[in-house]
Amino acid sequence: MSRSIKKPPFCAPHVLRLVNKAIAQNKLNSIINIHSRSSVILNKFIGLTFGVYNGKTYVPVKVNDNMIGRKFGEFSPTRRYTGHVGDKKVSRK
């Protein structure tokens, strides 16, 4: 079920505080590290770079206009795909 239209998009208050501070200090090129993967990307985030925590490291995410309305967690994968292991019988030949 999707979020009600009556409600505004969710964005953690501390993320908004960090963004407002970066804009006020004119630090638009610095990385803003956040843990809130469930926060929605808003219009005022365009052009900023966020470090989204994936459980181990901060993955840099540069926000552009195509990302508005999506969540930060979509751009920071938490699992690494290592591929399938090949069949040992085939490799012996």
Swiss-Prot record:
GO terms for biological process: ribosomal small subunit assembly; translation. PROSITE patterns: RIBOSOMAL_S19. GO terms for molecular function: rRNA binding; structural constituent of ribosome. GO terms for cellular component: cytoplasm; small ribosomal subunit. Disulfide bonds: none annotated. Keywords: Ribonucleoprotein, Ribosomal protein, RNA-binding, rRNA-binding. InterPro entries: Ribosomal_uS19, Ribosomal_uS19_bac-type, Ribosomal_uS19_CS, Ribosomal_uS19_SF. PANTHER family: RIBOSOMAL PROTEIN S19P FAMILY MEMBER, SMALL RIBOSOMAL SUBUNIT PROTEIN US19M. This is Small ribosomal subunit protein uS19. It comes from Ehrlichia ruminantium (strain Welgevonden).
